[in-house]
């Protein structure tokens, strides 16, 4: 009994598939880079807030709560915990598809 073999894709089809995959990977790379830049800015912001709180606590001047309220007036954005959790779980990671 002979088993029917799948015809192998032509070179042109394979190259087209590779181009499509590369294009999708480039889009994912751009998205990951934007996410990385956002996380970096959030981290720097948190470091600045932490230093401000430490200074306020050690100087005995402004309470940390008032210091935080002041930092919110600068337009600080809270970290999107759901988006960060998705990123850490790898839900937005590269997909692995084969032809």
Swiss-Prot record:
Source organism of this protein record: Homo sapiens (Human)
Name of the protein: Uncharacterized protein C20orf202
Region feature (Disordered): 50-77
